[in-house]
Amino acid sequence: MKVAVLGAAGGIGQALALLLKNRLPAGSELSLYDIAPVTPGVAVDLSHIPTDVKVKGFCGEDPSPALVGADVVLISAGVARKPGMDRSDLFNINPGIVKNLVEKCAASCPKALIGIITNPVNTTVAIAAEVLKKAGVYDKRRLFGVTTLDVIRAETFVADAKGLNVDKVRVNVIGGHSGVTILPLLSQIEGASFSAEEVAAMTKRIQNAGTEVVEAKAGGGSATLSMGQAACRFGLSLIKGLQGEANVIECAYVEGDGKHATFFAQPILLGKNGVETVLDYGKLSAFEQEAMEGMLATLKADIQLGVEFVK
């Protein structure tokens, strides 16, 4: 398996690369790209770690050499949030970066599974889809917005609040990947019950967890380490699916049946083609139903921004 990380010199990219070097299947190739000249050095640094994963680093304007033959591409390139910004404030810079990188993916590895980490994910995934359509290589089963960070935060916060073993906690998070579009399905968690006040507070904390990190870092960055872990978990799940492992399920922001919006985060079954099945997210509580209906205008507007960006 060959995995390419685009944006590999950044905070998320380096954390992700370190985790993948340690956790990819033996014999895998890890290809690191960033515009920054430090990137080949990041690869050399990682190459000293004793695992059977070959690492190569590429820098400069053209990511194509890093992409040839890639099975999975994870894109974290872009600028991070600073205090006072929300994910939509990144719209002035990051969409152009994602557009350029996905154009190169379309040319160099059109069959690869592409995971978009770069915010605002609600919009950048729509941009990626339009770019791939223009190139004639779009396959909705092979494009993902990585929302795993919302899932691992939900699992961590719930386990902490309820004194549960975090390894046993599973939380589906549906919708999108910013603010009110993040909807953890707390009503479905086995072995935990919440009062109405707890549901409202926990939902808000999960939705605002990124801001919690941005503020705590006091201008020194955003959630890079936890995002690296989340992206690694999702990337490894993509690979398990490609290798034919059964019952590999993650939540991700994908093009489904369009019932709610063109792109929607929900549980998916992964396989050799990427998304094998978009799974039903189950019955919602009254709170969740209201929250879901309330987010849709925001989500659809975010998606439309991406579509119009590429036109």
Curated annotation (Swiss-Prot):
CDD domains: MDH_glyoxysomal_mitochondrial
Reactions the enzyme catalyzes: (S)-malate + NAD(+) = oxaloacetate + NADH + H(+)
Active site: H177
Binding site for substrate: R81, R87, N119, R153
EC number: 1.1.1.37
Chain positions recorded as NAD(+) binding sites: G7, A8, A9, G10, G11, I12, G13, D34, N94, I117, T118, N119, M227
GO cellular component, one term: cytoplasm
Keywords: NAD, Oxidoreductase, Tricarboxylic acid cycle
Gene3D superfamilies reported in the protein's UniProt record: Lactate dehydrogenase/glycoside hydrolase, family 4, C-terminal, NAD(P)-binding Rossmann-like Domain
Database matches in InterPro entries: L-lactate/malate_DH, Lactate/malate_DH_C, Lactate/malate_DH_N, Lactate_DH/Glyco_Ohase_4_C, Malate_DH_AS, Malate_DH_type1, Malate_DH_type1_bac, NAD(P)-bd_dom_sf
PANTHER family: MALATE AND LACTATE DEHYDROGENASE, MALATE DEHYDROGENASE, MITOCHONDRIAL
Free-text function comment from the UniProt entry: Catalyzes the reversible oxidation of malate to oxaloacetate.
The protein, known as: Malate dehydrogenase
Organism: Aeromonas salmonicida (strain A449)
